[in-house]
């Protein structure tokens, strides 16, 4: 009996630093985007530890599935260790989520910049990057919702492994449900990564356009 890997990989990062083009609209936008990049430091910093924790938990689970309930003491110890790993990664995801959420106020500054800008083309460009950033946050919220739901299902599965009243069929059904929900998590992670790629593309297009207009 196997469980699919549920490693959360958000390897695409928001590369926003190093944009300096003088004053006016492009400089103000560059400053806002750099603020967003800095605010996401915690998001970037937890990725390696999160992946490592998930990998250890996955390895533990595979070992637990090879044990029988007759090996109760060993199984109980492994379940406790694995539950601790799960709690650790949820704390990391919470830190990651707080980092992403903290960018909301900076994104709102783009809306203010739209109001300040007189050029119609610049307004449209700014609205486009604001929209892409907000869509990225929305995509990340979907990731965390699905990820936390998956973690709850995994917690229930771990409890079943040491529950003498839980038969093999019940455990197999829970594994199936976990794997199905894991697919949903992977889909939402891909959606978030695609949204991040889109932000970076729009950012490059908009800043290049603003720089040309300023000449």
Task: Tell me what each language-model feature is.
Residues 2-10:
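Sec-dependent signal peptide recognition
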Residues 15-18:
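C-terminal motif of bacterial Sec signal peptides marking the signal peptidase cleavage site
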Residues 213-215:
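Short, solvent-exposed mixed-charge patches
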């Amino acid at each position: 009996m196997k469980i699919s890997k549920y490693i959360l990989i958000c390897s695409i990062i928001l590369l926003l630093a190093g944009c300096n083009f003088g004053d006016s609209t492009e400089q103000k936008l560059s400053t806002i985007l750099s603020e967003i990049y800095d605010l996401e430091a915690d998001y970037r910093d937890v990725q390696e530890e999160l992946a490592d924790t998930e990998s250890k938990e996955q390895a533990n689970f595979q070992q637990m599935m090879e044990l029988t309930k007759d090996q109760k003491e060993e199984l109980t110890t492994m379940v406790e260790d694995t539950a601790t790993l799960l709690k650790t990664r949820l704390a990391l995801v919470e830190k990651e989520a707080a980092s992403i959420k903290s960018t909301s106020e900076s994104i709102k500054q783009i809306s203010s910049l739209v109001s300040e800008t007189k050029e119609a083309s610049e307004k449209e460009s700014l609205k486009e990057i604001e929209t892409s950033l907000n869509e990225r946050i929305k995509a990340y919220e979907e990731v965390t919702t699905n990820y936390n739901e998956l973690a709850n299902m995994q917690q229930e599965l771990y409890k079943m492994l040491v529950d003498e009243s839980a038969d093999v069929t019940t455990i197999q059904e829970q594994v199936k449900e976990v794997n199905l929900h894991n697919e949903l998590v992977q889909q939402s992670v891909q959606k978030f990564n695609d949204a991040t790629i889109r932000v970076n593309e729009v950012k490059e297009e908009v800043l290049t356009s603003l720089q040309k207009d300023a000449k």
